[in-house]
Amino acid sequence: MSAPCHCQHADDDYSSIKKLSVLSPELQQEFKDPNHPANLICELCRLFYDNNWVTGTGGGISIRDVDGPNPNLVYIAPSGVQKERIQPWEMFLVELPQEKILRTPNDIPKELTKSYKYKPSACTPLFISCYTLRNAGACIHTHSQHAVMVTLFFENEKEFVISHIEQIKALPKLKYNQETGKIEKIGSMEYYDKLVIPIIENTPHEEDLTDSLQEAIKNYPGASAVLVRRHGIYVWGETVWKAKVYNEAIDYLLELAVKMKLAGIPLVKEE
């Protein structure tokens, strides 16, 4: 059975409230909050769809409830659904560090899900890796054409490197703290800095990327993203809004890099 059809922007306030009324009082209270992680995932998925980042059910997003009473709760969009139509009750809820699934959309009344059998996102182990290795507040996975094109232009490279572009300043400057054993933000990148993003090879199945993603995260403590060749990109940040900004800034730089490459302009300016 295909995923239930949730027409984008079609529901008025009354219709939305009517849908929520079939949920438990606890869930009704959760989903009425526009800043609830599940609602933010829906909002961002629509924005990302409009940017051609999550078309054809591709890509995904997850948010850790860093501002909630339990910051170990992670909300993850399901697999195989049209991201621009997603609804808050369709999220999987996972608790760290045991990675215990606390709630699935299959637990929701069938009036909302139309008996559709939801599957966890294949990105789940990769999202979890970003939370455990970087203490991220959110992780975004897109199938951006700019990300794919850059990995094709640099087919034999293991890194994407660019410098002397103003937009680099939107990204964090990170450093490994030997005393704490953690990656810490020490400021923002500067115009003269080199942005380095590791590139890993794609695999037939998304979850098989986990080991190489973890290795890249460990080997590149200054990175906030990992490119997957011929596939897309994973981007994370300390909050969902930081992750959004980093993703937008990186995609801008990737698009610019494609244009620079076509024009024969070096991506790294020598001092």
UniProtKB/Swiss-Prot annotation:
InterPro entries: Aldolase_II/adducin_N, Aldolase_II/adducin_N_sf, MethylthioRu-1-P_deHdtase_MtnB, Salvage_MtnB_euk
Pathway: Amino-acid biosynthesis; L-methionine biosynthesis via salvage pathway; L-methionine from S-methyl-5-thio-alpha-D-ribose 1-phosphate: step 2/6
A Pfam family this chain is assigned to: Aldolase_II
Entry binding sites for substrate: 123
Subcellular locations according to the entry: Cytoplasm
A molecular function (GO) term: zinc ion binding
Superkingdom: Eukaryota
The protein's required cofactors: Zn(2+)
Gene Ontology CC terms: cytoplasm
Protein's GO biological process: L-methionine salvage from methylthioadenosine
Keywords annotated in UniProt: Amino-acid biosynthesis, Cytoplasm, Lyase, Metal-binding, Methionine biosynthesis, Zinc
Cofactor, how bound (note): Binds 1 zinc ion per subunit.
Reaction(s) catalysed (UniProt annotation): 5-(methylsulfanyl)-D-ribulose 1-phosphate = 5-methylsulfanyl-2,3-dioxopentyl phosphate + H2O
Record: residues binding Zn(2+): 141, 143, 231
SMART domains, alphabetized: Aldolase_II
Record function comment: Catalyzes the dehydration of methylthioribulose-1-phosphate (MTRu-1-P) into 2,3-diketo-5-methylthiopentyl-1-phosphate (DK-MTP-1-P).
Protein family membership: Belongs to the aldolase class II family. MtnB subfamily.
PANTHER family tied to this protein: METHYLTHIORIBULOSE-1-PHOSPHATE DEHYDRATASE
HAMAP family, sorted: Salvage_MtnB_euk
Protein's recorded name: Methylthioribulose-1-phosphate dehydratase
Species, as recorded: Candida dubliniensis (strain CD36 / ATCC MYA-646 / CBS 7987 / NCPF 3949 / NRRL Y-17841) (Yeast)
Source lineage: Eukaryota, Fungi, Dikarya, Ascomycota, Saccharomycotina
